Amino acid sequence: MKGVYFVSGIDTDIGKTVATGMLAKQLLQQGKSVITQKPVQTGCQDIAEDIAVHRKIMGIPMQEADKRRLTMPEIFSYPASPHLAARLDGRALDLDKIRTATQELAAQYEIVLVEGAGGLMVPLTEKLLTIDYIQQQAYPVILVTSGRLGSINHTLLSFAALKQYGIRLHSLVFNHIHDSRDAHIAQYSLSYLKCRLKADFSEAEWMELAKTDAV
């Protein structure tokens, strides 16, 4: 791996933050120079909570890039989608600020993992969806899914969107932490999605996040 990767999910609260932190930790253990970024954090006042979770999982303190807000360029107080949180805070989301911060991180680190807010179709602004931004920046996507009920549908919809927009899927991360309590559903979801990934995105990697990785 090298460059900037966008971590998205099939839904809200699917485990993107833990997945991002665990992947960054694994890369650190491999001797890679890696940093995570949360370009838009909502529901916070000062520090991006997701970045704090990343650092805890990675086993490192807050970095200089964190102190300079390069890893958390836009923070809004209301816990909502970025476009609504920005409106309620009475200011516009600054896409140029986000792009510049990511570029600066990419110049300093071998790998940058950018954790998005929610799923691919979450609005960043009134006119721009998250998937539009990913396409504009030509970022490969790391998609987080799970074995809970509904995940097959949401994952296949995400696959279809990535294909429609011509975006490369780097990997699908199956998050066991958010599995269904029904073991049959969880296991079938895993086997089905593993087969669909091979059929739809043959070059993409399959990864799994174990329950023991929960923070």
From Swiss-Prot:
Its EC number is 6.3.3.3. Pathway: Cofactor biosynthesis; biotin biosynthesis; biotin from 7,8-diaminononanoate: step 1/2. The keyword Cytoplasm applies. Its cofactor is Mg(2+). It is an enzyme of class 6 (ligase). ATP binds at residues 13-18, 50, 115-118, 175-176. One of its GO terms (cellular component) is cytosol. InterPro entries: DTB_synth_BioD, P-loop_NTPase. One of its GO terms (molecular function) is ATP binding. Homodimer. Catalyzes a mechanistically unusual reaction, the ATP-dependent insertion of CO2 between the N7 and N8 nitrogen atoms of 7,8-diaminopelargonic acid (DAPA, also called 7,8-diammoniononanoate) to form a ureido ring. Belongs to the dethiobiotin synthetase family. This is ATP-dependent dethiobiotin synthetase BioD. It comes from Neisseria meningitidis serogroup C / serotype 2a (strain ATCC 700532 / DSM 15464 / FAM18). The lineage of its organism: Bacteria, Pseudomonadati, Pseudomonadota, Betaproteobacteria, Neisseriales.
